[in-house]
Curated annotation (Swiss-Prot):
The chain crosses the membrane at residues 20-40, 63-83, 101-121, 141-161, 186-206, 227-247, 268-288. Keywords: Membrane, Transmembrane, Transmembrane helix. Residues 329-363 are annotated as: Disordered. It is a multi-pass membrane protein. The lineage of its organism: Eukaryota, Metazoa, Ecdysozoa, Nematoda, Chromadorea. One of its GO terms (cellular component) is membrane. It comes from the Eukaryota. It is found in: Membrane. This is Uncharacterized protein T09B9.5.
């Protein structure tokens, strides 16, 4: 997309108000998502007493969202600069698929991680090592590397192996419109929908199995279930609308390309960026160990975050629902008092959290 003096290879820059608006919104969401997901990755490693495999997957999802935000930030910052140029190099279907390959990888890897987190929730057990922060060299396991390699292969299948016989020009790059074989596009959207939906089903099944247990695993599963419901709903809406646009354009060959690009910009790009922006906030708000780790890592958050003012999620029993009001012994302390208490290394034997951890390990 470099400036070129050849008018045959040039297209007029997009200067419509909608394009400026979308670019500005995506840049704001990308900056926020990049900063918060980078910080939440550090917090995930310190979120005891969550099991290490669960922390590892949550950190992997946060890294994925950080990469997605960084990619979108670079892309929109470049567009923001070149939109004022008198001539832009015309985008083709081949160059568009090359540009959007990292985006497809992030979407597939995110869906696969959500699916694995749902499956993993049915087999979690606390170990004594889970009470301590996770080492950085344990952040990536062999099977996580395998999943990433499979996601790269699937991304290549949906982009590089598309039989694009004609390198057609495009007004604006959109990966769903650049793939010439429509069944690949529908297969990609179907795969993402199924992975997110199946992951939610598995974590809801885990919450049913854990409903009678009063442990940190059950609290964490119920908290993650709330996050999964919101994020899966947003993903389903995004992917469903994107599929409708692709189907509309596939059925009606002479359709409004500008309308399709605008809808896909909103549904397929902005909504996932909004999810990546909200994901760290959901984790800190709903998951109690994440809140505790966040305030221990960044004590300044005690003044801004209503840490421990919320009780853990309700854990329904077979006949009724019960709320376990567990609060930190630091609930009424200021940040200075908290730091002073931690400097004295006061034992936490009276903390409700330690009692529950012992129950988990005893199980």
């Amino acid at each position: 997309m470099l400036t070129t003096p050849n008018p045959d290879l040039c297209v007029e820059p997009f200067i419509e108000p909608s394009q400026w608006f979308f670019t500005l919104v995506e840049m704001i969401l990308a900056v926020g998502g990049l900063i918060m997901n980078t910080n939440i990755t550090v917090i995930c490693h310190k979120a005891s007493p969550m099991p290490h495999p669960q922390r590892r997957l949550l950190a992997s999802i946060s890294i994925n969202f950080a990469i997605l935000s960084g990619f979108q930030l670079a892309r929109n910052f470049f567009l923001f600069l070149v939109m004022q140029q008198p001539c832009l190099n015309q985008v083709t279907t081949v160059s568009c698929k090359l540009q959007q390959f990292p985006l497809i990888f992030c979407y597939i890897h995110c869906a696969a991680s959500f699916f694995l987190l749902g499956v993993q929730s049915n087999f979690l057990k606390l170990k004594p090592i889970d009470k301590s922060p996770m080492k950085w060299y344990l952040s990536c396991s062999v099977w996580q590397s395998t999943i990433a390699a499979v996601c790269v292969a699937l991304s290549l299948l949906f982009t590089a192996f598309d039989q694009d016989l004609e390198n057609e020009p495009m007004n604006k790059c959109s990966i769903l419109l650049a793939v010439s074989q429509s069944y690949l596009t529908f297969s990609l959207l179907t795969l993402l929908i199924l992975l997110h939906a199946t992951g939610l089903i598995f974590i809801m099944l885990a919450s049913v199995l854990q409903r009678d247990k009063k442990s940190w695993i059950s609290f964490t599963i119920f908290s993650l279930k709330e996050i999964f419901k919101y994020e899966t709903l947003a993903w389903q809406i995004s992917l469903f609308i994107s599929g409708c646009v692709v189907l509309y354009r596939h059925v009606l060959r002479e359709s409004c390309d500008e309308c399709a690009v605008i809808v896909l910009e909103l549904a397929f790009l902005i909504v996932p960026l909004l999810i990546s922006f909200m994901h760290p906030l959901y984790l800190i708000w709903y998951v109690l160990p994440m809140r505790d780790a966040a305030t221990r890592t960044f004590p300044c958050m005690l003044s801004a975050l209503p840490e421990y003012s919320l009780v853990p999620p309700q854990v329904p029993s077979a006949s009724t629902s019960a709320t376990f009001a567990i609060q930190s012994p630091r609930a009424d302390l200021t940040p200075n008092d908290t730091l002073h208490m931690e400097s004295k290394k006061k034992p936490l034997s009276q903390s409700p959290r330690v009692v529950i951890e012992e129950e988990d390990v005893a199980e």
